[in-house]
Amino acid sequence: MAKDEVVDRVTALAESLLSSQEMELVDIEYKREGRHMVLRLFVDKAGGITLDDCALVSREFSEILDVEDFISENYTLEVSSPGLNRPLKRESDYERYRGRLVKVRTYDVVEDEAGNRRKTFLGDLEGLAGGVVTLKLREGQMARIPLAKIAKANLEFEF
């Protein structure tokens, strides 16, 4: 089974399990690390995820994967919180984390309101409207980035 198919199937199974526990699937990684495959689930819930939550999901999801048995390669299952630099994956994330500092990387060069052309932006998330993410950049100007041009977006931790 191709990696994309594994990720799609794991996503469906994980979302079903997690919704019953009032948790959400933030992201999935399925990749080779050294000679082994690693299936990594990043999960969260309102109020934050605990180590016990991760252990519970790991046990229960491991049982589901053993029953479904669709991953042909040997792999290691890891369940983790998304961490301080949580990725923004869904449109709802851009509303949920409004006002927070984010780092956005784009596929193509995007111009901010001052005419600066770049692919990496750091600023406070103003929100998402009409398929466009708005950031108030650290330099003071605004940037409007089409969601379709975003390669990666993460919360940034401020010290």
Curated annotation (Swiss-Prot):
<comment type="function">
    <text>Required for maturation of 30S ribosomal subunits.</text>
</comment>
<dbReference type="InterPro" id="IPR028998">
    <property type="entry name" value="RimP_C"/>
</dbReference>
<dbReference type="Pfam" id="PF02576">
    <property type="entry name" value="RimP_N"/>
</dbReference>
<dbReference type="InterPro" id="IPR036847">
    <property type="entry name" value="RimP_C_sf"/>
</dbReference>
<dbReference type="InterPro" id="IPR003728">
    <property type="entry name" value="Ribosome_maturation_RimP"/>
</dbReference>
<protein>
    <recommendedName>
        <fullName>Ribosome maturation factor RimP</fullName>
    </recommendedName>
</protein>
<comment type="similarity">
    <text>Belongs to the RimP family.</text>
</comment>
<keyword id="KW-0963">Cytoplasm</keyword>
<keyword id="KW-0690">Ribosome biogenesis</keyword>
<dbReference type="InterPro" id="IPR035956">
    <property type="entry name" value="RimP_N_sf"/>
</dbReference>
<dbReference type="Pfam" id="PF17384">
    <property type="entry name" value="DUF150_C"/>
</dbReference>
<dbReference type="GO" id="GO:0000028">
    <property type="term" value="P:ribosomal small subunit assembly"/>
</dbReference>
<dbReference type="GO" id="GO:0006412">
    <property type="term" value="P:translation"/>
</dbReference>
<dbReference type="GO" id="GO:0005829">
    <property type="term" value="C:cytosol"/>
</dbReference>
<dbReference type="InterPro" id="IPR028989">
    <property type="entry name" value="RimP_N"/>
</dbReference>
